[in-house]
Every structure is written in structure tokens, then in C-alpha cells.
């Protein structure tokens, strides 16, 4: 209290909200990834996997790909070269899953924005999905972004569970979404800085 921190602390929201929205505008004007992959808006699910427990254990990785293959829905999977090699050396990929090279940020955010759903084990992508108003399925047993689960826009699924495809298909977030991470965050921050 002596330092005056309480009087000079302000809740503005998460700067990532503005970052995603501003970079999405750039991505939509510059990225050609949607045309390059020949996919239409909300015609595919976007998959990202990078956590050791999902990609280093060949049994879990194979299980996840087989479960996702059962959905029959098109899945775009930008895959790390090490994971791609493991997949190629171990088993075949279901026909509905298209492996692509890892994508740069603008191409990736364009893919996120056009996806029907996002399936991930990433922390940051869960939040990006929420900001972009995309249903998110997180292949983990916990999340650092509990708000996204509380708001019913993020479904946690244990990667070793069965019937993952049916759980994904039946997941439907509410129509309305609250701004749990804030809005106009940069504007609020600038106003506070200018007023100090």
C-alpha cells in the first residue's frame, strides 16, 4: 500500500484481443492460405498438436488421429516436421486429415478465422479461438484459460478418451459470447497512460 500500487493499478483487459483483431485484418488482406489449400469458410476443422504427451507418445498420437478420422470432417493439420516424420514412420493418416507445413502467423490466423472449429492442445490458441468466436476443443485435461471453459466456448477432452469425434460433433457453444478478455483494450491503456 505504501508504494501506491493500489491507486495506480487498472484493469483494462487482455492486449491479445486487440493484437488478434488487428493482425486478422492484415492476414485477411495478405494471406492466400485459404485459396492455396482450396478450402471454403467453415468447411474444415483446424488441428494443432505440439505438447509432448500428445505427439511424443505414438500410441496417443495414433489414437488421436484415428479418433479425429472417425469424424469424417475435413481437418487441416499444420504439423511440425518431427511429428510428421513420426507419423510417416509409424502409421497412415486418415483421409479426412490433411497435413500441411507449419504456417506463419498471418496464414495461421487466417486458417483459424475460417475454420468451423479449432482442435488444439495449445494455450494461446484457445484464447485466439475465443476471441475469433470459434468453438475450441482442447485435447488436455486442464487449461490456463478457464474463462473459455466457463463460458462454454472451450471443451476439454482427455487425449486418451474414446469417442472424441462424437464429443466434438455434439459440442455447441452458446450463440452469445461475453467479452471476458475485454474490448478496446489498447484504447483504454492509452487513455490511462495519457491521464497519469
Q: Model segments located where?
A:
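Structural alpha-helical scaffold elements that stabilize or flank donor/cofactor-binding regions
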Residues: 38, 110-111
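A donor-sugar binding/catalytic signature common to diverse glycosyltransferases
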Residues: 111-148
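Active-site donor-binding acidic/aromatic loop of nucleotide-activated sugar
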Residues: 96-104
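Oxyanion-binding "anion nests"
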Residues: 45-94
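A nucleotide-sugar donor-handling region in carbohydrate enzymes
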Residues: 1-55
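Short acidic active-site motifs
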Residues: 107
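A short acidic/histidine/glycine-rich donor-binding loop in glycosyltransferase catalytic cores
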Residues: 137, 152-157
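Leloir-type glycosyltransferase catalytic cores
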Residues: 23, 155-196
Amino acid at each position: 500500500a505504501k508504494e501506491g500500487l493500489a491507486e495506480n493499478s487498472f484493469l483494462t483487459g487482455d492486449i491479445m484481443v486487440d493484437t488478434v483483431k488487428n493482425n486478422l485484418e492484415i492476414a485477411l488482406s495478405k494471406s492466400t492460405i485459404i485459396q492455396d489449400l482450396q478450402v471454403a469458410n467453415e468447411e474444415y476443422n483446424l488441428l494443432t498438436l505440439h505438447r509432448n504427451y500428445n505427439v511424443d507418445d505414438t500410441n496417443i498420437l495414433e489414437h488421436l488421429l484415428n479418433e479425429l478420422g472417425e469424424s469424417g470432417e475435413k481437418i487441416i493439420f499444420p504439423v511440425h516436421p518431427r511429428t510428421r516424420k513420426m507419423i510417416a514412420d509409424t502409421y497412415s493418416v486418415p483421409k479426412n486429415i490433411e497435413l500441411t507445413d507449419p504456417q506463419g502467423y498471418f496464414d495461421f490466423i487466417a486458417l483459424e478465422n475460417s475454420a468451423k472449429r479449432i482442435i488444439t492442445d495449445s494455450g494461446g490458441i484457445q484464447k485466439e479461438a475465443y476471441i475469433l468466436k470459434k468453438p475450441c476443443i482442447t485435447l488436455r485435461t486442464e487449461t490456463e484459460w478457464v474463462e473459455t471453459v466457463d463460458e462454454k466456448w472451450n471443451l476439454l477432452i482427455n487425449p486418451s478418451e474414446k469417442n472424441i469425434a462424437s464429443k466434438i460433433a455434439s459440442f455447441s457453444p452458446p450463440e452469445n459470447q461475453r467479452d471476458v478478455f475485454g474490448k478496446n483494450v489498447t484504447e483504454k491503456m492509452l487513455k490511462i497512460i495519457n491521464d497519469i
